[in-house]
C-alpha cells in the first residue's frame, strides 16, 4: 500500500512515526489472536464436529454473536469479520470458553495458567492496539513479543 502519510491534517511527524511502530505491533497481535481463535476452533471441531457451536455457546455468547452478525448483514458494503462465531466473540470470551472446556485444552497446554496469564495481561495491550492507541512503554511491547513467541513455541508442532 503506497500512500503518503506526511500530509495528514493535524498530525505531527511523531504521530506518523508512532503509527509505523504500532503497525508492527498490530501484526503480532493479529497473528496471536487469530492463531488462538483457530486453535480453539480446531479443538472444538475435532471434539464436537460441525455442531460444536451449538454445544459450547451460552446465552451471552449466542446473543453477542447474533447481534454482531445481524449488524454486519445490514452493512453489506463492509466485509464480514469471519466465518466462525469465534470471530465475533471478544478476546476475554475466548478465555472463558477455554476455562469452561479446560479438559479439551490441557492435552495441548499442560497448565491452563499459560493461557490465562497471557490472555489476561495482553487484553489491555490488545485493546490499545485495536483502538489505534499508542504503546510507549517498552515493557508492554517486549511482553507482547515474548508472549507471542511463547505461544508459538508451545503450539507450533501440535497436530489436532
Residue ranges of predicted features:
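Amphipathic alpha-helical interface elements
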Residues: 1-160
